[in-house]
Amino acid sequence: MTDSQQSKPKHVMMMAAGTGGHVFPALAVAKQLQQQGCQVSWLATPTGMENRLLKDQNIPIYQIDIQGVRGNGVIRKLAAPFKILKATFSAMRYMKQLKVDAVAGFGGYVAGPGGLAARLLGIPVLIHEQNAVAGFTNAQLSRVAKVVCEAFPNTFPASEKVVTTGNPVRREITDILSPKWRYDEREQADKPLNILIVGGSLGAKALNERLPPALKQLEVPLNIFHQCGQQQVEATQALYADAPANLTIQVLPFIEDMAKAYSEADLIICRAGALTVTEVATAGVAAVFVPLPIAVDDHQTANAKFLADIGAAKICQQSTMTPEVLNQLFTTLMNRQLLTEMAVKARQHAQPNATQHVVDLIQKM
């Protein structure tokens, strides 16, 4: 390696598009790479949410025109090879122009052509899969990638290039105090159990409609914090209207400080997206996961099993959420010692150093 090559900062192109589940972990890694002196650029789609999320992040964006083909109509599928080829050439042009040294793909439509472009140019590729079941793009790229990162064990067949890193999470989540300390403090203060229900930014209608009737049947003192989405506040409040006196209820459109919410919760009831499961484990909170039934390849159930299989969480499929089933489940869980044990197990299986682990792997390529 020449002196000029040694003095040139490593240029890493990030590839992530479409959803926050892809973009947020990639952004955490990108910011850490920048802090270590790397030059970072981002391969994006023209209309994806990544453009909005990266607006003030001081990361230059380069767009290629690509859309998903899985499950779409015949005409789009026939046109797909030509669109992929065009997008691949566009990505190759950017990579040569920018003198990219390494490429890191985190999923989304953009990662396919980008990974292929890097492969054709001889640029090393790292991919990161956030879910317990690999997405279509990452499953294909795993064949040509130099390093394959998985958030959950056994997502990919065992290989020297496969590394279980966990999912990168925000610093405020990794800084939450230990679950044993938090739960013991609340027990010593003889506080009611805190139940946190998180339906996401749009609100999970099934959680909003089915949980209040079941929770109202419980006889123990509870503080319920129910995040239901902006459009479902009034309807959710109405379902709690005749709640008994042992329940203290707050219905919220959204929660700005999730780290605080995690730290104060004894039990969380939520979907099982990859980042949600990762944050629950990192925070150390007992959980009931209700996987999204329409998730591709039922990956949310696979995500939830990561914690359920070690006794840190329960899985309740949406199709089984009857008042009787929920009442039986919640009655079992209204035990602070059990919840403490679940929370401790969750934290024990977290990987809070995932961001730095992925960064180190990129730096070594």
UniProtKB/Swiss-Prot annotation:
Q: Output the Gene Ontology cellular-component terms.
A: plasma membrane
Reactions catalysed according to its record: di-trans,octa-cis-undecaprenyl diphospho-N-acetyl-alpha-D-muramoyl-L-alanyl-D-glutamyl-meso-2,6-diaminopimeloyl-D-alanyl-D-alanine + UDP-N-acetyl-alpha-D-glucosamine = di-trans,octa-cis-undecaprenyl diphospho-[N-acetyl-alpha-D-glucosaminyl-(1->4)]-N-acetyl-alpha-D-muramoyl-L-alanyl-D-glutamyl-meso-2,6-diaminopimeloyl-D-alanyl-D-alanine + UDP + H(+)
InterPro entries from the UniProt entry: GlcNAc_MurG, Glyco_trans_28_C, GlycoTrans_28_N
Q: What's the protein's topology in the membrane?
A: Peripheral membrane protein
Query: CDD domains from the xrefs?
Result: GT28_MurG
Provide a GO biological process annotation.
cell wall organization
The record's keywords, sorted A to Z, are: Cell cycle, Cell division, Cell inner membrane, Cell membrane, Cell shape, Cell wall biogenesis/degradation, Glycosyltransferase, Membrane, Peptidoglycan synthesis, Transferase
What the entry lists under Gene3D superfamilies is as follows: Glycogen Phosphorylase B
GO molecular-function annotation terms? UDP-N-acetyl-D-glucosamine:N-acetylmuramoyl-L-alanyl-D-glutamyl-meso-2,6-diaminopimelyl-D-alanyl-D-alanine-diphosphoundecaprenol 4-beta-N-acetylglucosaminlytransferase activity; undecaprenyldiphospho-muramoylpentapeptide beta-N-acetylglucosaminyltransferase activity
Matches recorded under PANTHER family: GLYCOSYLTRANSFERASE (PTHR21015:SF22), UDP-N-ACETYLGLUCOSAMINE--N-ACETYLMURAMYL-(PENTAPEPTIDE) PYROPHOSPHORYL-UNDECAPRENOL N-ACETYLGLUCOSAMINE TRANSFERASE 1 (PTHR21015)
User: What protein family is recorded?
Assistant: Belongs to the glycosyltransferase 28 family. MurG subfamily.
Q: Which named protein is this? A: UDP-N-acetylglucosamine--N-acetylmuramyl-(pentapeptide) pyrophosphoryl-undecaprenol N-acetylglucosamine transferase
Species the sequence originates in? Acinetobacter baumannii (strain ATCC 17978 / DSM 105126 / CIP 53.77 / LMG 1025 / NCDC KC755 / 5377)
